[in-house]
Design a protein with these regions (language model features):
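Glycine-rich phosphate/pyrophosphate-binding loops
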Residues: 63-85
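Short beta-strand segments
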Residues: 38-41, 72-73, 108-111, 176
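A cross-family phosphate/adenosyl-ligand binding-site feature
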Residues: 1-25
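Structural motif
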Residues: 34-35
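Alpha-helix C-terminal capping segments
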Residues: 22-29, 57-68
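Glycine/threonine-rich flexible loop motifs
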Residues: 44-53
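Electrostatically charged, flexible surface regions
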Residues: 84-198
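Short glycine-rich anion-binding loops that position phosphate/pyrophosphate groups of nucleotides
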Residues: 14-15, 41-44, 113, 180
């Protein structure tokens, strides 16, 4: 049970698989699905993070199923200002309800700050999110060695580039429209000249 919800289901699996199952079960019950919201995630999904993100994958699964998808993240693994992301998410909900094009997945990233400390909102392209590599070695309960990734984001010169990563560094919230087609169209013609055979 969830407060103020007409109904709720709980699934165990990857975020995208859970969305896939949720959509299936709801459709079987005759429920019209208006949109898929994923999050609010602990930790930003900026730039190249989107390639690894379960939060973005869950929202994208909605898009693949023909349903608008929105991923929401707070740029901290220990967020303390969900209320800031909640307010923006409610505003986005109203815009998505009014309609967005097919195939669009929105990725929202919000600084872990009170609303009054956020400089504003930027509609931003994806940037390069690189990390200073750090791995923590631990021993699990079975006595096996495990490694936990603890990389720290590289800080970029915000004067040289403008994207979601640098906007977050400057304490802006960001919205980025995504699509699932990762094809490098510019290289496709060159690739066809390889004339490979199998």
């Amino acid at each position: 049970e969830m407060p103020d919800a007409k109904g709720a289901m709980k699934f165990s699996g990857t975020p995208a698989d859970c969305v896939k199952m949720g959509i299936r079960f709801l459709k079987e019950k005759g429920v019209q699905i208006d949109m898929v919201f994923s999050g609010i995630n602990h930790g930003g999904n900026l730039g190249t993070d989107t390639l690894y993100s379960g939060t973005v994958a869950a929202a994208m699964e909605g898009v693949i199923c023909g349903i608008p998808g929105v991923a929401v993240s707070v740029d901290s693994h220990r967020p303390s200002h969900f209320e800031t992301a909640c307010k923006l998410t409610l505003d986005v909900f109203e815009k998505v309800k009014a309609g967005i094009p097919d195939g669009v997945c929105l990725s929202i990233n919000v600084p872990n700050l009170p609303a009054e400390e956020i400089k504003g909102l930027k509609y931003a392209s994806l940037g390069m999110r690189q990390y200073i590599e750090q791995f923590e070695q631990t021993i699990n309960q079975q006595g096996q060695t495990e490694y936990w990734y603890r990389g720290l984001p590289v800080i970029y010169n915000c004067d040289e580039m403008s994207n979601d990563v640098t906007a977050m560094q400057q304490h802006y919230a960001t919205i980025t429209p995504l699509k699932f087609d990762l094809t490098h169209e510019q290289f496709m013609q060159e690739l066809c000249k390889w004339e490979l055979k199998i």
